[in-house]
Amino acid sequence: MTSKPTCLIVASAASAGVSARSFQQCFNLCNPVFNLQTATPGGKSIDFTGVDDSTGRWVQEFSIKPYANPAKLESIDGARYQALLIPDCPGAMNDLAHSGSLARILSHFISQQKPVCAVGQGVAALCCATEDQKWIFSRYSMTGPSVFELVRSSEFANLPLIVEDFIKDNGGSYTASIEDAVHVVLDRHLITGQNIQSTTAAVNNLILLCNNR
């Protein structure tokens, strides 16, 4: 029996948190397929947002498991992982989007063409990855939250980053569907999902990509 590949789930430690629904779907789909490791900046615990009746019990049960304690993103060696997954994280634009540690890991994944998957507001985390003042995902096609989706938030005027604008301004190719529609883009080894609703489709593509390697 072959050993399972290892997947790193990177989550935000910012106060805006991590989508409970997206993280639950990521974890439940990946757990049978991968050995999982979670990581956050500073190894801080994950602050779940949008917890409701369907996710509340799962979050409670998850929080007492050993793997609920994230590793420090700063100490992660990207070479140890075969896949990288960033769920929908409203907090990503506050910390992951500027993380030198995540940039280092993403540079390794690009150099080795290893699968990377980012969903919804987690796509903002990809903005951290620059080399020689150039974004390493320029010339990639991708999606992420559209302005039409983001503008519905009361925090829109205070957002430090608009993913759609960043991608277009830094040489990427951006597409989106209508608000809240399932929309996933696969370009080479990069998978992006537009929103929380796209989580399952994006992660299933990550699993397929890993199975084909």
UniProtKB/Swiss-Prot annotation:
BP terms from Gene Ontology: methylglyoxal catabolic process to D-lactate via S-lactoyl-glutathione
GO cellular component: cytoplasm; early endosome; extracellular region
UniProt signal peptide: 1-20
Subcellular location: Secreted; Early endosome
GO molecular function: glyoxalase III activity
UniProtKB keywords: Endosome, Secreted, Signal
Assembly and interaction partners: Homotetramer. Component of the FERRY complex.
Annotated function: Component of the FERRY complex (Five-subunit Endosomal Rab5 and RNA/ribosome intermediary). The FERRY complex directly interacts with mRNAs and RAB5A, and functions as a RAB5A effector involved in the localization and the distribution of specific mRNAs most likely by mediating their endosomal transport. The complex recruits mRNAs and ribosomes to early endosomes through direct mRNA-interaction.
UniProt record similarity statement: Belongs to the peptidase C56 family.
Name of the protein: Glutamine amidotransferase-like class 1 domain-containing protein 1
Organism: Danio rerio (Zebrafish)
Gene from which the chain derives: gatd1
